[in-house]
């Protein structure tokens, strides 16, 4: 083959090196900043902003997290006392009233009211619990701080019986100060708590006094089924706020993400955040059940009727609810990120003058906060926040679904009328001739399905392979998985396209590939639009931008065809004059069958005939003047070549001769219309999904989903390369092949855990208080949970029993070391309960066809050194009531499926609960067979111990922490670390 040279290198030409370099640079230019934004948290300012004290906030966090402080611990009471002390210190340090007026005459020093709520309690069952047959009685110890706004009612309306506020609603900011029994609670939710303390200080600073009143809620009991938020609804001040900001944590650092929001209007203040971070896709994850856990947000929005936002830390999940959720493993940068977002959002909400948060409630018992429009929101590189209404996206989607195909159709008609529609045309006839000139306009049309399907199928196959062989490798090596998927997809797409291009070269590869992509994107946008309209899911906004870029790129390809000669003109210029076969333009496999196979080329003498030199003749001889839009190739001397292949000026290798008229720089514009949009919109979603889910396999979630999701996102991210990848050189794809082979081997054989990415196992110890028999257990993923249990000294020469766990995979149990949660007390005295059966006074009517009648009993229960117990029933009870409990129509107290568990929480230690239960039995159960147990109610009385702040109190847990492998972390399996029980039968 004669060497191919460009007379002058065009840096934007549709040739191998420009395409390779430009596409690689663009992808790196966007992916690297996205990774930096995702993993690097902005540093806090060197000087404290007005009204804030970051040094004090960090010191407060260290005090708060110096011990485990679950609701059922003595340390929890100490934290409660310390918080009240800190609040009063902040309020006492507030400047005198005259300083406020000197800054803003309309905003005098606000009045502040601190409520230590030790009165509210509530019984409820069902709707937001993980199981609808679980009931709860809870006594709250919430702390509320109300900073009166300048526009608020100046009367203490909450002191009146059934008092209600007047005027506009206020703003609630919430964080919970309890931790889990196995975690120090630095991010869950210590950062949220110290942020609330800083907000109190900020809005007590002159110049920041609120217009709308601010209620800061530090609730206790979130970790045990959001109890504190529900009990907040029983306090009179809960009638006042209409909007809220919930601060939460599910990791140990990083950026605080906007998880979800109620509507566009309440989200708008978040736009003022200096470092916005998040996507509405996370909200869709909650709405569809993909994210199973919940925060206090659901209570405020669903149960109480407020409108608000949920801001939380989300990674790493391996440290969530473990002893590494401490101040050592978070940072001041993370604290500043949440604090800055909270200040900006809260200031926007309390400064609002409109009535957009007033209106009829969705339920008579809920707050009259009105309603807003569903929102679409996402950040751009952690610096800009994009927010618009969902119906705007819906309208744009519908418009584009109609306009885009019409635009291509009109363009196609115009091309046909101009006689320049080369697509799908195999030949063209010359004027006044029966002979036709081949156009090869169908070549490349069927290429895209293979280019798209083969790499996608292989990556999905890899997802299944890794799930089968080493499903938890993504726990510690998520980027090894991403590298495997990306490299495999890219190499296969390049290989398939190069093989197709070698066999049947065509200048129509780009336009046909874009046309297929347009159709695929159109179908995806139809599906996305349907979900937007029917289910209110906004997370598919990326599909709209993908379709927009694909449409414009496709349209440009169609417009390019106007630069071609008319087909009849081309046929006249290339009318056959001889009958010799040529390999030019044909298939490069087998016999020549291309453009010149059926046409007579110029005679050899005409081809070799030289033009007379002119002023514009190229100095390189036989060439043409270069233009920005076209290639200029200088062919070698074919007479000296060992092959009959020859290239025509402006034609890329063996592609159709008419393609010489196509511009060669427009591919750059097409690529820039697609790739950056996809990377900006889909890249953060891919990182968000990976961070949220790559360590959830340890919790019992399916590992396959995250692998398949990565495979799908890989396809989404790399699809913009398909129209251009056949022009890539071999260097990068071959390198990616090596990357693929290395990461594939690693992902299949590497151990999935490490000391920095530990496997979370869930501990609990059960003790039969009647016999003293105790069993310790770890729940988690096999075979790792058994391997961890086998390393413990107490399991040596012991039988470890492993059974299937309902939610955690496998539970391995062994005779554990005796707990000392109630020292110097016999096991039988750890829990006391009595049962008195209450007979139904209503006489059954003769001839009553109802074969069921209720039975009732009163159970009195108390535990030593605890304030948490529960009642478990083998069969559901129909109703329950706790003596002294409040009820609320917003929180049901019965379930249509009955109740099999009643959880009891008291603010007092060693409290005695009196519980009335009722259940129905068949009249047949009163027969003699009933004496054998058919009519009886069987169950257990259980008390919980969760205080793990002293070594030796729970030796079995201490043993796991000391002797388990370094790649193991311990978390709680239930509300109690130790659960002691006694059986009963009524």
UniProtKB/Swiss-Prot annotation:
The keyword Nucleotide-binding does not apply. Zn(2+) 2 binds at residues 188, 223, 321. One of its GO terms (molecular function) is metal ion binding. Zn(2+) 1 binds at residues 176, 188, 248. Its cofactor is Zn(2+). GO terms for biological process: proteolysis. This is Vacuolar membrane protease.
